[in-house]
Regions:
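Non-catalytic cell-wall polysaccharide-engagement segments
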Residues: 1-12, 16, 99-177
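Peptidoglycan-targeting cell-wall enzymes and recognition modules
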Residues: 16-37, 41-42, 65-140
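Hydrophobic alpha-helical context, especially transmembrane and signal-peptide helices
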Residues: 46-51, 80, 146-151
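Short, functionally critical alpha-helical segments immediately adjacent to catalytic or ligand/cofactor-binding
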Residues: 51-68
Length: 177
């Protein structure tokens, strides 16, 4: 739930009346705290409001890392600086540039590249995600249709169960204040 206070002019023209605006968001009561964090940040930091778009992103993250931040491709559970090859983290940043940019981002913005919080911040701000963000912000498409920008954002080699996971998330998301 996101709350905002908006000042409105009163009838006498001098005083203002504050009203509270409460925006509804998608919640996942049965999700893990890590999943809930990513879901909340995606809605807070972007204009993604479509259930299927959010579910597609969540399904992709589950396929890539199982929402484990300290995970190196192949399963080694290590901090950021100890992953020497393959992908790392939530979306398995694989290329040298993407991996290094995670570290640079967290150094610049004082976050830890080994945590869900640091990686979520980077993921949302990363140029690869930003390039396809508008496609996720356009509402009304199927999960399969949101898998197209997901593929270009992530560049996965193996599709795996990401679509299946996305449908599971879509079934668990609840529209609430």
């Amino acid at each position: 739930m996101f709350q905002t206070s908006l000042p409105l002019p009163s009838n006498d023209g001098e005083n203002t009346i504050e009203i509270e605006v409460i925006e509804k968001t998608w919640k996942c009561p049965t999700c893990t705290p890590k999943e809930q964090h990513v879901l909340e940040e995606l809605q807070k930091r972007t204009n993604i409001r479509d259930r299927n778009a959010l579910a597609a992103i969540m399904g992709n993250i589950k396929q890539e890392s199982g929402f484990k931040a300290k995970i190196c491709e192949g399963g080694a559970k290590v901090p950021y600086k100890q992953c020497r090859y393959g992908g790392y983290g939530l979306i398995q940043w694989t290329t040298t540039n993407r991996y290094n940019n995670l570290g640079k981002f967290c150094k610049k913005y004082d976050c830890d590249p080994s945590t869900i919080e640091g990686q979520t911040r980077f993921m949302i701000n990363e140029s690869a995600f930003q390039r396809y963000l508008s496609e996720f912000e356009n509402a009304g498409f199927s999960i399969e249709q949101y898998m197209v920008p997901s593929y270009y954002w992530l560049g996965w080699g193996i599709k795996g169960n990401r679509t299946h996971y996305a449908y599971q998330y879509a079934g668990k998301l609840v529209w609430t204040e």
